[in-house]
């Protein structure tokens, strides 16, 4: 029988509500904040007892229902992501010894594909070579819904395996616009310095700009919001990004 402490749950709920109200009171919802000020605020109001993820949400002026306006890609995080990423490489048998020196957590061939079929999906990123894509396609229905299927557009189907493993391990974030035209991603940890968070924000926004579909008309970036796992969001002043300011001129 479960031993549930109702009083503790109620107390924890009260503390959370109190903390979130206090955090919200420090944010002017009518204001668009400079990126440095926004980073300072989210660090100040962070109240969770764990190292929260710093999240970014971007509203785009695209129609994702049109296939030529789907925004998708990867952004390299200069400050890293604060996460340990487990990487699996699926390659031809004759490439096993070569790719075992890349720093991947596991390097295999058909054995990894069979493990996936059995439900053993123990890695955060799967990388493969073009020559193995026919074999890997056998598990597309398993990896695809989890966002783990190797994809040439994301750089995870490549012959330059060593370079991609290095980039993934050093910290990069995948992004894809949702049906409402929004992109959400975790771009670091609240324990990062303000300068480290800013560097990641700039890199992420720059990657979004570079991924702008030529068919998208009107304002592309409509809103950028910063928050932590448990905290309220802070709206950023889009003009505070040099890349965006240059694009608008």
UniProtKB/Swiss-Prot annotation:
Taxonomy, superkingdom: Bacteria
Cross-referenced Pfam families: Ribosomal_L1
InterPro entries: Ribosom_uL1_bac-type, Ribosomal_uL1, Ribosomal_uL1-like, Ribosomal_uL1/biogenesis, Ribosomal_uL1_3-a/b-sand, Ribosomal_uL1_CS
Span of the signal peptide: none
Full protein name: Large ribosomal subunit protein uL1
A single cellular component GO annotation: large ribosomal subunit
Assembly behavior: Part of the 50S ribosomal subunit.
Family per similarity comment: Belongs to the universal ribosomal protein uL1 family.
UniProt keywords, alphabetically: Repressor, Ribonucleoprotein, Ribosomal protein, RNA-binding, rRNA-binding, Translation regulation, tRNA-binding
GO molecular function: rRNA binding; structural constituent of ribosome; tRNA binding
Any Gene Ontology biological process: translation
Keyword Thylakoid: no
Function comment: Binds directly to 23S rRNA. The L1 stalk is quite mobile in the ribosome, and is involved in E site tRNA release. Protein L1 is also a translational repressor protein, it controls the translation of the L11 operon by binding to its mRNA.
